[in-house]
Regions:
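Hydrophobic residues on short alpha-helical segments
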Residues: 39-47, 63, 84
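Short, locally clustered residues in the helix-turn-helix/winged-helix DNA-binding domain
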Residues: 4, 44-51, 67
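C-terminal helical "lid" subdomain and adjoining coupling/linker elements of P-loop NTPases
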Residues: 1-38, 53-55, 73-79, 97, ...
Length: 146
C-alpha cells in the first residue's frame, strides 16, 4: 500500500519496513483500546515514567502513580494485588516487560516493570485516558512530538 500511495514502480525494503512499523502501531493501538479504564490508567502511569527515562520502575512506585492518576480522574484506585495481576496480563499482551528481582532475605522480592512498546505509539493510543487524567509533566514534551 505504501508503494502504491507513493506511485513507486516497485516495492522496496523501506516500504516493507515502514509497512510493518505501521501495522505494529495499529496492533498496539487496538490492544490498548481493548483494555479497561483502570488498565489504561496503569499503562499511562508506566508511560509517564518512561517519558522521564525512569523505566523500568518498581511496582510499588508504579502503584503510587496509578493511585494519583485515579484520583485525578475521579476514580477509586483498585488494590495493589489487582495491579500485580493486571501487570501480568499487560506483559502477556506484549505491552510491558516484567523483571522479578530477589534481594535475598534483607531486600525481599519485587518486580520492575518497563514499557515494551514505542512510547509515542502508547501515548497516542492513550489519548482519551490522558485527557481524562490530565497531562503529566513528564509526557508534556512527548505529546508535542505526536
Amino acid at each position: 500500500d505504501l508503494a502504491h500511495e507513493e506511485n513507486a514502480d516497485k516495492v522496496t525494503e523501506d516500504h516493507v519496513r515502514r509497512g510493518r512499523e505501521l501495522l505494529q502501531r495499529e496492533e498496539v493501538t487496538q490492544g490498548i483500546h481493548g483494555l479497561n479504564e483502570h488498565e489504561q490508567i496503569l499503562l499511562y502511569a508506566l508511560a509517564s515514567y518512561s517519558s522521564d527515562d525512569l523505566s523500568p520502575v518498581r511496582s510499588r512506585d508504579l502503584y503510587h502513580r496509578y493511585e494519583q492518576f485515579c484520583s485525578h480522574s475521579g476514580l477509586d484506585a483498585l488494590t495493589s494485588r489487582w495491579m500485580h495481576d493486571h501487570i501480568d496480563e499487560l506483559e502477556m499482551l506484549g505491552l510491558v516487560s516484567v523483571d522479578k528481582k530477589n534481594k535475598g532475605s534483607s531486600g525481599g522480592q519485587y518486580k520492575v516493570i518497563g514499557l515494551d512498546q514505542e512510547l509515542l505509539a502508547v501515548l497516542n493510543a492513550l489519548e482519551d485516558t490522558i485527557n481524562q487524567v490530565g497531562v503529566h509533566e513528564s509526557v508534556q514534551t512527548k505529546l508535542t512530538e505526536l
